[in-house]
């Protein structure tokens, strides 16, 4: 009988790693299928060489059964095209968008309305992939992204420089912390400035130091869990005349310099994973 019990324990121990490996393989296959989907805008897919969605989302440990909030999806829903289908069956993907009526009247409000309308149209065009995408509108000076403690992962791609420039970054990181479950993940990708760059230069260039982003997160209560080189670009010197917008995809430069900046590619980016400590 003792031998039988020991054997059962050994079998259970052996099955646990195998089961974990099987789940990881299934998640990877589902992510690959979402990245390869023919519903993606070809222009978006062509930028995978710069944005590395597989490596990035794997590093952030996003799985198909999670509740995930992406903050102000860029590029007409660049990551929405991947995360919407990936999370459709077992998880929940929420695109958090600025409420146009909470934006300043005029160009700002008009721009946010167009941004929202364009994303809605994109989602409506492919219901088989995007019919379960949730939208949450928020006020930029009072951001709130979910019920407290309800989200597994919050993701933000190339947004933090906007909040730093607008003086609202601390509000956003606190809202991320509030939305996440204890043990939840905050994934941040951001244009990376050279260490020691002063705040005014960061605001003008769109590049932020890792030190600043880490401080914003840890001041809000997060713990830095890991860094990834997935979106690093050593060709980017981060000192361009028109800041990060000099580079693709914005390409704010003289036409004769196009080849130079195309050879550099998109910006050098930090990829940081933070965790909300378990209570």
Residue ranges, per PLM feature:
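C-terminal motif of bacterial Sec signal peptides marking the signal peptidase cleavage site
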Residues: 2-4
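Bacterial signal peptide processing site
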Residues: 6-8
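Conserved class I S-adenosyl-L-methionine
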Residues: 64-75, 83
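Conserved beta-strand signature within the Rossmann-like core of class I S-adenosyl-L-methionine
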Residues: 94-96, 183-192
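A short acidic, Gly/Pro-enriched loop at the edge of an enzyme's catalytic core
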Residues: 130, 143-154
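A short, conserved alpha-helix within the catalytic core of class I
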Residues: 140, 162-175
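C-terminal lobe and adjacent flexible extensions of AdoMet/dcAdoMet transferase-like proteins
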Residues: 220, 259-279
């Amino acid at each position: 009988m003792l031998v039988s019990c020991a054997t059962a324990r050994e079998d259970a121990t052996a099955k646990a790693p195998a089961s974990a490996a099987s789940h990881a393989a299934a998640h990877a296959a589902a992510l690959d299928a979402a990245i390869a989907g023919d519903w993606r805008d070809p222009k978006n897919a062509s930028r995978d060489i710069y944005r590395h969605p597989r490596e990035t989302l794997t590093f952030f440990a996003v799985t198909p059964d999670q509740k995930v909030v992406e903050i102000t999806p860029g590029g007409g829903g660049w990551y929405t095209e991947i995360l919407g289908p990936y999370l459709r069956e077992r998880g929940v993907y929420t695109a958090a968008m600025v409420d146009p009526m909470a934006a300043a009247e005029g160009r700002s409000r008009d721009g946010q309305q167009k941004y929202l309308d364009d994303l809605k149209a994109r989602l409506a065009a492919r219901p088989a992939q995007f019919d379960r995408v949730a939208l949450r509108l928020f006020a930029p000076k009072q951001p709130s992204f979910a019920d407290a403690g309800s989200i597994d992962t919050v993701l933000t791609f190339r947004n933090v420089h906007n909040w730093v420039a607008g003086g609202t970054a601390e509000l956003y990181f606190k809202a991320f912390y509030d939305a996440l479950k204890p043990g939840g993940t905050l994934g941040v990708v951001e244009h990376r400035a050279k260490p020691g760059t002063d705040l005014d230069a960061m605001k003008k260039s769109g590049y932020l130091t890792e030190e600043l982003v880490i401080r914003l997160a840890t001041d809000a209560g997060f713990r830095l869990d890991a860094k990834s080189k997935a979106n690093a670009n050593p060709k980017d010197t981060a000192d361009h005349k028109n800041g990060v917008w000099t580079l693709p995809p914005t390409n704010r430069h003289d036409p004769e310099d196009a080849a130079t900046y195309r050879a550099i590619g998109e910006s050098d980016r930090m990829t940081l994973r933070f965790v909300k400590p378990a209570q």
